[in-house]
Structure formats: C-alpha cells, structure tokens
C-alpha cells in the first residue's frame, strides 16, 4: 500500500478536477499492479511533482535501481515515452526508458540523482553551457515518420488564432503591443515549423546527474508551477559536479518542431535581465542557430506568446514582468 502525498492530492484535485481525482483513486492499485508485473520492490519513500507519483524501486531480476513513474495521460505527457525511446536510440542524453505501459502511461525509468541537479552548479556560465550542449544533442534528432508526437505547426496555428483575443484582454497598452509583436514575429516563421524532437522545457532543474544515489529521474514538474511557466529560484551555492558526471535530461513535454522554440526556459529560469542576451547567444551558437538568430528570436517570442496566452486564459490581465523584460530585450527595446 502506498501513501499518496497530500500535496499531490491537492494539485490533482485543483487543476485536473474529476480526472485528477479518478487518477488518485486508481493510484494504489496501479502501483501494486506494476510492482508485481515488472518484478519491482520498493526502495524508499515516494516522491511527487505537480502531476506524477514516483516510487524508487529495485528491479528484482537484476538488482537494478529504477524509478516507477505514474502519471495521468494528457496532451503533454502522452509523448514522453515516444521521445525517450527516440532519444535513447540516438544516445542523445535523455533519461533511459526501461519499460512502458501505453494504456496507463506508467513508465519505468533509470534512477538518477535528484540531489544533484544542474541548478546546483554555482558557475552560471558553466550551467548554461552544459544545458546548451545537452539541448543541442536532443534537438538534433529528427522525428521519425508517424511517431505521433504533437507538432509545433499545429500548436502555433492555435496560438495565432487565440492571440487577438488575448491581446485585447490585457489591461496595459504597452503589454498589448508587446504581445501583438510576439504574435507577428512567430507568424513570420510559422510556415516552417521544423522536424526535430523537442524537449519543450529543458532548464537547470530538469537536468540531473547520472547515478542511482537517489530517486528522482522521473520527478515531474519541479520546473513549473500552476501557471505552466518554467520555474524560478537562485543559483545553488555549491557545484555538485564531479569529472565523471553524466548530465541527463528528464521530464520532457515533447513535440516536433524547430529547435529555436526550445530557448526560453534557459532565459526565464534563474532570471537575470543582464544575462538574457549572452545566454541567448550562447544557446544559439551551441545549437548551430547562430546564422539564424532572427529565426531563433522569432520562435522564442513565440514561446513568450504561448505563456501570455496561458496567463490570459488563467484570468490574468497583466503579463509576468520577467516575460515582458525578455520580450523587450529580444525586440530591441531593452
């Protein structure tokens, strides 16, 4: 029998309503089912994020530490095992998928060290460099034909349909112009949405050091609050890395598209207005986008539009100040 954390109960009930409550009700039985089906034994206290429950386990057949991840299947999570398999075949640096049940979305993942996230690296430039290099590996992988992942072209089409109403809903005239300019920028590149497998939310908290010292490879949503924007927090005081560390990407919300759509989390997470330009330049260079910076800029403005649309849909009439500052800088108004 597992104990479901109160915080997971609260978030599932608040944000997913009846669907969330049904997921919670099924969790104890589902956990027991997969512990038995996949030959696993519990190996520590359960962890959770906004939507997932993660159980540290050991695979009895070979003694391998692993992480059993149970989460609802929705538009964002449905593609996670697909992307992990594609990246795994390419050796791109994502957490290894050991097993998966398509009917429930349950996954068995390699166990990483949640006590050593990239966010704990004190040297900001080194952390951005590691993130950029990992992102370059992930976004270099073409999406296989018929993979079923959601596509950036479809996402952007919906965004552009919603943009005029969202612009009108904002109470600040300058922010209305800013959001309209974000929409105009992404409209220019929407006709070529790209064909790479994107992580969508790769930032410092979604990169962990390899190793099974702790369960956490599958700990979801450490990066995003209810507003669905990348998380915040200060740089760690201690650099936890060793020379042998293998940095691994976790928690993708994958889609197929242009790598330029991947840059915003690295700009807004651990926000520093003075760092936006050099982070953007470093990221575009690492991803091979330095000759197409205008295109990367447009896609990043598209991500800002996406966040703005979500804010308005949540009832907000002002944009997040950090989002406004990044948009101003990318539009040359900072």
Language-model features and meaning:
Residues 23-35, 140-200, 210-211, 244-245:
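An alpha-helical support segment within catalytic cores of ATP-dependent transferases
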Residues 8, 12-24, 28-29, 258-261, ...:
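Helix-rich C-terminal or lid/interface subdomains of diverse kinases
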Residues 55, 95-101, 194, 297:
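Conserved beta-strand elements flanking the ATP-binding pocket of the protein kinase catalytic core
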Residues 1-94, 210-223, 228-247, 330-334:
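Conserved NTP-binding catalytic cores of kinases and kinase-like/nucleotidyltransferase enzymes
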Residues 209-217, 221, 232-293:
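Active-site Asp-x-Gly
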Residues 24, 28, 64-138, 274:
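A conserved alpha-helical element in kinase catalytic cores
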């Amino acid at each position: 029998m597992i104990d479901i954390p109160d915080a997971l109960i609260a978030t599932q009930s608040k944000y997913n309503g009846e669907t969330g409550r049904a997921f919670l009700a099924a969790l104890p039985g589902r956990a027991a089912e997969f512990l038995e089906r996949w030959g696993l034994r519990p190996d520590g206290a359960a962890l959770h994020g906004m939507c997932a429950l993660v159980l540290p386990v050991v695979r009895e057949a070979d003694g391998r530490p692993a992480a059993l991840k149970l989460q609802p299947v929705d538009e964002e999570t449905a593609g996670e095992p697909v992307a992990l398999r594609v990246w795994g075949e390419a050796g791109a640096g994502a957490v290894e998928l050991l097993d998966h049940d398509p009917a429930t979305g349950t996954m068995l993942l390699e166990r990483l060290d949640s006590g050593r996230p990239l966010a704990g690296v004190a040297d900001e430039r080194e952390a951005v460099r590691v993130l950029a290099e990992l992102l370059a590996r992930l976004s270099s992988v073409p999406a296989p034909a018929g993979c079923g992942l959601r596509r950036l072209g479809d996402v952007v089409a919906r965004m552009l349909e919603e943009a005029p109403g969202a612009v009108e809903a904002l109470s600040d005239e300058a922010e209305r112009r800013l959001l309209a300019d974000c929409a105009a920028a992404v409209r220019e590149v929407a006709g070529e949405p790209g064909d790479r497998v994107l992580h969508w939310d790769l930032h410092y908290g979604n990169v962990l050091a390899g190793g099974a010292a702790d369960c956490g490879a599958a700990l979801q949503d450490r990066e995003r609050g209810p507003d669905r924007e990348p998380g915040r927090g200060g740089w760690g005081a201690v650099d936890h890395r060793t020379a042998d560390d293998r940095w691994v990407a976790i928690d993708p919300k994958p889609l197929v598209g242009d790598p330029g759509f991947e840059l915003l989390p690295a700009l807004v997470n651990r926000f520093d207005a003075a760092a936006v330009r050099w982070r953007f330049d470093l990221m575009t260079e690492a991803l091979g986008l330095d000759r197409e910076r205008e295109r990367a800029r447009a896609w990043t403005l598209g991500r800002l539009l996406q966040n703005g649309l979500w804010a308005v849909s949540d009832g907000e009439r002002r944009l997040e100040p950090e989002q406004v500052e990044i948009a101003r800088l990318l539009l040359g108004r900072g």
